[in-house]
Amino acid sequence: MEPYILQDEELNELVVKIPGWEIKSKQIQREFNFANFNEAFAFMTKVALICEKYNHHPNWENVYAKVIIKLNTHDLGGITNLDQTLASEINKIFDQ
């Protein structure tokens, strides 16, 4: 998949189509909350495997049962279709 920067209209659609994500400072981000650290870490492990598949890696934070994921495409300096795809895949993992 060749990444391209999403335009304003596409970004507005993104936050509607992919629930929970918001646009902040040229990136999209979402906070995920779990019952405990083990659930949070299991989620991060599953996300890591998808990230490897797309060769696209998030900035993320984990504090106990909370995971914050931030996505953008550093090489292009903004939010791309690849970030959109990865956010959608991450939501699927969370919804399992």
Curated annotation (Swiss-Prot):
The protein's enzyme class: lyase
Matching Pfam families: Pterin_4a (PF01329)
Domain of life (superkingdom): Bacteria
Disulfide bridges in this chain: none
Keyword Lyase: yes
EC number: 4.2.1.96
Catalytic activity reported: (4aS,6R)-4a-hydroxy-L-erythro-5,6,7,8-tetrahydrobiopterin = (6R)-L-erythro-6,7-dihydrobiopterin + H2O
Keyword field contains Lyase: yes
Entry keyword set: Lyase
GO biological process: tetrahydrobiopterin biosynthetic process
GO MF, any single term: 4-alpha-hydroxytetrahydrobiopterin dehydratase activity
SUPFAM superfamilies: PCD-like
Family, similarity comment: Belongs to the pterin-4-alpha-carbinolamine dehydratase family.
PANTHER family to which the protein is assigned, alphabetical: PTERIN-4-ALPHA-CARBINOLAMINE DEHYDRATASE
Protein name: Putative pterin-4-alpha-carbinolamine dehydratase
